[in-house]
């Protein structure tokens, strides 16, 4: 269960190194070095690969459109998934990639939440990295925290073990 907002946000904030093509994300998967462009007043990531010699990471062509180029495919996938859920006699495994903010304190530990990064420049002109849990609005309009891959994978393993009676 991954909301379209999650896909949209991940695509729109994706960047790549123009030299080695390594992908990162300006909000969700940053590099060691962050830069600031005085002309555009924007922050950018600097590639971590030594061979790239400090290349400035750039937005992939078309990513500014978010999910629009793949919306029909996502809708078709959703329709197929809903149809599959109607099958009887077949055990189901349900995975959630987010947890409502209101429930998070009772159900998750902080390290299970996807970190989101923002940046600001302090008085000494140094870039300050701010880390907070990434909040998304799920498809039901509920403000939620996105989960890291490990807790989702653990849920998958536990449910499969239960279904297989292991």
Language-model region placement:
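Glycine-rich phosphate-binding loop of ATP-dependent small-molecule kinases
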Residues: 1-166
């Amino acid at each position: 269960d991954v909301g379209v907002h999650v896909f949209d946000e991940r695509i729109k904030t994706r960047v790549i190194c123009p030299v080695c093509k390594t992908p990162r994300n300006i909000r969700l998967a940053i590099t060691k070095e962050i830069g600031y462009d005085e002309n555009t007043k924007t922050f950018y990531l600097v590639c971590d690969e030594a061979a790239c010699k400090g290349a400035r990471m750039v937005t992939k062509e078309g990513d500014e459109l978010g999910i629009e180029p793949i919306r029909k495919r996502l809708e078709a996938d959703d329709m197929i998934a809903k149809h599959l859920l109607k099958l009887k006699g077949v055990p189901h495994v349900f995975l959630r990639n987010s947890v409502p903010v209101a429930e998070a304190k009772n159900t998750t530990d902080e390290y299970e939440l996807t970190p989101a990064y923002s940046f600001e420049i302090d008085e000494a002109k140094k870039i300050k990295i701010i880390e907070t849990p990434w909040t998304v609005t799920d498809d039901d309009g509920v403000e939620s925290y996105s989960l890291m891959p490990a807790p989702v994978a653990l849920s998958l393993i536990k449910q499969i073990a239960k279904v297989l009676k292991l």
